């Protein structure tokens, strides 16, 4: 290729350098991309001169088209570059690589060829009977043929058991994977579980109990069977321990009457799985409570997960949903749910409690509290009525404040309340709550008739002579007791004086001394 980029020259090269690598991208094709394409052609056994013509690019595209879907990044880049060069040779105006690839595929109908090839491949891989290979038993040439379970199905079952750890999801997963299976296939699904042998032992005990109950209710007919007649299945036959695959197929599809041993065995296994799930998930629905900061949606998920593992009739589960779901919610959600009325739907509850406990709900409550407080502050002063006129504390006049008063500043004592001196220079004691009255320093009395200005004031109603006055009686008792004490003190004093007189010297000489 001479200079390494002789595939394009002149105007073709200018057009090539204007095409973008990606839609709406900044990078564009350069000469180095042509040099790289020439080197890559040798790896696929193609000559580099094929890039110089439209027909040569067409041959390269035909070679690379089958390899492009599963090829490497280098092969895909070479295919895209050949499409761009073909568009330049064919004078097809394109803006980027993606548009060039679409133009080439539409011109050579490569899209239709790919669809036909994929359709042909699917037809060759489909089973002859027209049934899906995922179904264990298929009808081929008017004969029922058993197909073993695919490793993908078994792997999905084992992965579910290992991840969910016998959660409530295991039972519906088993129902989906074992649809249409025979007893042989169900046993195969149970045998691939390596761990959890304790759970499998519980499952076996449930299967044995159900098989014994089947044998008790389905007694085999007495006497030998007619020639060519198929025997009735026993409990062990349904469990797949004493029956072959062909016998299970005959009982399921050709017997008269038909007995779907696979479906019956699935019921037994589902009962055992439900018991295992209940034992491995001891948490009851009654114990599910919403946390103080837990979203209501997460609480509902935990509640229904525990309810799914609960072995109870449907009416009991409905009662649990209607009562316990609201009863065990936190106070915030419970207050909202009770406002929805009787028997609200789950959708209404989820919408009503959306965001409760989160930052948005807390911010909303904070805004409501602040608005209520602001309203209380605004409404509070209005109840006291309008404020009165301003009063000066210096001169006592209305209309101005003390700092605006033009009168001389008066000094007032805070102890006695008089004007002219300060509290530190006050000679009087501190005034009590009654202040200083006309009684001076004496204790004020509560009786009006003892006041100086009301000495001659008499009560208008006459006193009741027969009325009992406890205060007067008590005062009389105090007066009598005081009189007795004074008399005792006087008598004691006189006795002491007499004793002193007896021991004096005047008694020795008589009255003449």
From Swiss-Prot:
Region (Disordered): 115-135, 215-234, 481-513
Record keywords: Capsid protein, Host cell membrane, Host cytoplasm, Host membrane, Host nucleus, Host-virus interaction, Lipoprotein, Membrane, Metal-binding, Myristate, Phosphoprotein, Repeat, RNA-binding, Viral budding, Viral budding via the host ESCRT complexes, Viral nucleoprotein, Viral release from host cell, Virion, Zinc, Zinc-finger
Pfam families xrefs: Gag_p17, Gag_p24, Gag_p24_C, zf-CCHC
Cited InterPro entries: Gag_p24_C (IPR045345), Lentvrl_matrix_N (IPR000071), Matrix_HIV/RSV_N (IPR012344), Primate_lentivir_Gag_pol-like (IPR050195), Retrov_capsid_C (IPR008916), Retrov_capsid_N (IPR008919), Retrovr_matrix (IPR010999), Znf_CCHC (IPR001878)
Sequence motif: Nuclear export signal, positions: 16-22
Motif mapping: PTAP/PSAP motif: 459-462
Modification note: Capsid protein p24 is phosphorylated. Specific enzymatic cleavages by the viral protease yield mature proteins. The polyprotein is cleaved during and after budding, this process is termed maturation.
GO biological process: viral budding via host ESCRT complex; viral translational frameshifting
Cellular-component GO terms for this entry: host cell cytoplasm; host cell nucleus; host cell plasma membrane; membrane; viral nucleocapsid
Site (Cleavage): 135-136, 432-433, 447-448
Motif Nuclear localization signal in this chain: 26-32
Extra facts: This is an African green monkey isolate.
Domain topic, free-text comment: Late-budding domains (L domains) are short sequence motifs essential for viral particle budding. They recruit proteins of the host ESCRT machinery (Endosomal Sorting Complex Required for Transport) or ESCRT-associated proteins. p6-gag contains one L domain: a PTAP/PSAP motif, which interacts with the UEV domain of TSG101.
Reported function: Matrix protein p17 targets Gag and Gag-Pol polyproteins to the plasma membrane via a multipartite membrane binding signal, that includes its myristoylated N-terminus. Also mediates nuclear localization of the preintegration complex. Implicated in the release from host cell mediated by Vpu.
Family: Belongs to the primate lentivirus group gag polyprotein family.
Protein name as catalogued: Gag polyprotein
Organism: Simian immunodeficiency virus agm.grivet (isolate AGM gr-1)
